Every structure is written in C-alpha cells, then in structure tokens.
C-alpha cells in the first residue's frame, strides 16, 4: 500500500428532521389535540484512531463525507428516526486541522480515541410541544437544525520514541532491522527508504520502545531537495534522535564529517524545536574497517565536527543532557545491544522525570485552589 501522510477532506453532518404539525383524528374525537412528533437528529461525522490503519491513502480518493439527514416527525406523537453517524478510521498519530480557522480539531494519539468532526443537527420540535392553555390547537412546529460542515487537513505524524536521522545509505534501515522485527527494503543505493518505517525494539517482557526510520536527508532538504524533508515532521513526536553516520562510504570523495554537519544544518533550518531535541551520534559500518583504521577515522571525524562530549571509552556517568556517541556495525550487530540498552535507560528516566514534574504541577495547582478559598478569621473554610 502506498504511504500517504497528508490529505484534505470535507465533512458534512446531516440536517435534523423537521418537526411535524399533526392532530389526532379518531372516531368520536372530532377535536383531537396536537400529536406531531419531533424530527430525528442528523448523522454526525467522527474520526477514530485505529492502530490497524497505517496511511491516509483512502482520503486521497474520497474527499467528501456526508452524513444522512434525520427523518421528519410524524403524527400520533411518532418521532422521526435519527440518522446513523459516519466513523472515519484514521492512523494513530493523525493531526486534524480546520482549513478555514487553522484550529487543531484533534490529535489522535491512542487507539480507539474518537473525536466528533461535524455534529449532526438537532431534530425540529413537533406541534405537540406548543400546546398551551390559550392555544389548544397549535399549528406551529420547528425545522431541524443544519448539520455542521468543515474543510479539514489531515496530517499523519508517526508516533515513535526514537527517530533515525542521516544521509541516504547511512545504514538506518539496517539498524532498525538489527534491533527490531521491522523489515524495510535495504539496498546499496541512496533513497532505498521511500517512506517511514516503524520497529518495536523489545528489551525484555516489560520494556520496549518504538523506533522510526525516515528517508535519508541531503543538503538542501529544508528547501525541498530529496525525499527526507517531507518526512522530517515524523520526527517531531520523538523523544530522542539518533544521527547515523556512514564512517566507511564506498565513494572515497565523500567526507562523513561534512555530511554530518550538513544534516545538522538542514535540521536547524527546517525547525529549531526539532534541532533542539536530544540527539545522539551513531558511527556506523565499523565492520568495513580494521580496528586501527576505525579509531583513526573516528578521531578525525570527531575533531572535524567539533565533538567535545565524552567518548565511548571515557569513564563518565552520562546524564540526561549530555549527547552520547556510539560506534556500531548495524550489519554485524556490533555495539547495537549497548545502544538499545542505553536508549531504554534514557527513555525510562525521561518518563520518570516527566511523571514527577506532572505530579508536582498538579500538587501546586491544588495548593493554589485551596489558598484561594475564602476563610474565616480562625482559618476555617467558610461554607458556601
């Protein structure tokens, strides 16, 4: 299936059915009172996050979704039937934006999440509601309300804990294959990866994280060159970026340090927030070099990019803020286990810190509410 991560659609809810104007007409009841029923509600349009849906491709072909109108009311106090709702299944990670107001309508972040995109109109009132002591035979009823209508932009941003960043052919797809069950296409030419791939990295029965591989970036990506710029947005939800560098390119004219600096520059031009995310350096394809050559190239690379952070062999207790460096071979799995274990430790600690921060903010908010309560001179709360 073709991967589509953007689409524009129109949704329109159904109109409510009109209320009925009707009177009882039975034998021996010549002047029966009003018995017009209400109209049925119009159908609404909903979006539902579905973990089994991976792309927005169907919304490229069908662009308008119209719910049915409610039925009109009937005599004998019979209400019109309400119209069925329409439920649009969308991938988890879909951001829905109103094209007219630029308002974010919904951000579908978990399976089963359901959001109303267009609410169906209420049914009109039948004349039975307008009977009074001064008007025993009202002919008044109300029409059903119009349903809501919207033009929407759908944008899929994959949900992953870790994102892989790098030039085409840096070995990102090989890495995600080495550490997860994902099986992206791998070949010895640039732009083998044409759309994002997700892989679940399982540490043990209780710990795992999701890794995302996007098409490689090239210089000028922020201005639209290559494929990667279209998919950089998929890294915006990640908590950690891995910058994968090919330390042993087949083309001897390629300078890994210059390519790495170009990637960082493109990232900064594209989005300062994305540039500011925690980013670790992963030097790949060490299996192509002997140990001495690997160390020589690593030292030259680190000097060229101005790396002044700890190196893998340094005795250093990493903290949450310090970028980390790894030397691996994704093909032979050399160094990959240490990499995934450090990622897992980092993500676990990150979640713990975020949970503590949320609890502290909640406690502070509760204290503020209590302090704002009116008190008596003795400090006891006044009853409302």
Curated annotation (Swiss-Prot):
Amino-acid positions noted as binding GTP in the UniProt annotation, renumbered to this chain: 166-173, 191-195, 213-216, 284-287, 329-331
Span of domain Obg: 1-159
Full protein name: GTPase Obg
Biased composition (Gly residues): 33-43
Top EC category: hydrolase
Similarity comment: family membership: Belongs to the TRAFAC class OBG-HflX-like GTPase superfamily. OBG GTPase family.
Residues bound to Mg(2+): 173, 193
Cofactor(s), names only, from the UniProt record: Mg(2+)
GO biological process: ribosome biogenesis
CDD domains listed in its UniProt record: Obg
GO cellular component assignments: cytoplasm
UniProt entry keywords in alphabetical sequence: Cytoplasm, GTP-binding, Hydrolase, Magnesium, Metal-binding, Nucleotide-binding
Keyword Manganese set for record: no
Gene: obg
SUPFAM superfamilies: Obg GTP-binding protein N-terminal domain (SSF82051), P-loop containing nucleoside triphosphate hydrolases (SSF52540)
Oligomer status and interactors: Monomer.
Domain of life: Bacteria
Species name: Neisseria meningitidis serogroup C / serotype 2a (strain ATCC 700532 / DSM 15464 / FAM18)
A family per Pfam: GTP1_OBG
